[in-house]
Amino acid sequence: MELVPKFLAGLILLTLCVGGCYAQHWSYGLRPGGKRNAENLIDSFQEIAKEADQLAEPQHFECTISQPRSPLRALKGALESLIEEETGQKKI
């Protein structure tokens, strides 16, 4: 019975080791890649702060899609012109 817990513990340990070996290394600047000097750490944080400020600025987007005229609006305009013609003919 002691064989199963030892085997299970070994399997979990092996899984963690393999996962750790394949993990991506993240540098000080929170960017994937190689190691960086601790001297450049402040520069990295300032770069991240600038990027965060750029994302915080509101972006204004303009709608470039023209809305088609409603068929009811066109029908209303046609009816108004017909009514004007009818009333204009009766007045003459």
Curated annotation (Swiss-Prot):
Residues 1-23 form the signal peptide. The record marks 26 as: Appears to be essential for biological activity. Keywords: Amidation, Cleavage on pair of basic residues, Hormone, Pyrrolidone carboxylic acid, Secreted, Signal. GO terms for cellular component: extracellular space. Its main location: secreted. It is found in: Secreted. One of its GO terms (molecular function) is gonadotropin hormone-releasing hormone activity. The modification Glycine amide is found at residue 33. The modification Pyrrolidone carboxylic acid is found at residue 24. InterPro entries: GnRH, Gonadoliberin, Gonadoliberin_I_precursor. Stimulates the secretion of gonadotropins; it stimulates the secretion of both luteinizing and follicle-stimulating hormones. PANTHER family: GONADOLIBERIN (PTHR10522), PROGONADOLIBERIN-1 (PTHR10522:SF0). Belongs to the GnRH family. This is Progonadoliberin-1. It comes from Tupaia belangeri (Common tree shrew).
